[in-house]
């Protein structure tokens, strides 16, 4: 790997594709808590983290698999689930007394209308303060899952299920 004195081996977490240290430093210097959104094929995870010298402390978190408690039976890795998870996270965080933070998407590509920004829209709609532009949010039709209901018979009730789950989440935290 390193073949001479001029070769610099990147940090391990950078080599693994897990940490962007330049972005992390900027986020830490901002002095605000970080709202970390991570997505996989099956889930969306959101955490509110605060940096300490010993390591980051998690204040609040939500995972899209928690939506089953609110009657959501759709896929947990799609845009609809990302929005609902963001909504759940925002209301949980507000209930615990946290009011805002700054978005950390890590090494994920920043694409307008993506699941990351669907989760961000859910967080913002809950009343949690995150500085952002509304230009990056997906359309309301995509958030409700109408694009899935059009072509997939099993998910034809997804928009109704979305509204019912959203009402249950608001009912629990009001």
From Swiss-Prot:
One of its GO terms (molecular function) is structural constituent of ribosome. GO terms for biological process: ribosomal large subunit assembly; translation. InterPro entries: Rbsml_uL18_euk (IPR005485). CDD domains: Ribosomal_L18_L5e. GO terms for cellular component: cytosolic large ribosomal subunit. Keywords: Ribonucleoprotein, Ribosomal protein, RNA-binding, rRNA-binding. This is one of the proteins that bind and probably mediate the attachment of the 5S RNA into the large ribosomal subunit, where it forms part of the central protuberance. Part of the 50S ribosomal subunit. Contacts the 5S and 23S rRNAs. Belongs to the universal ribosomal protein uL18 family. This is Large ribosomal subunit protein uL18. It comes from Methanosarcina mazei (strain ATCC BAA-159 / DSM 3647 / Goe1 / Go1 / JCM 11833 / OCM 88).
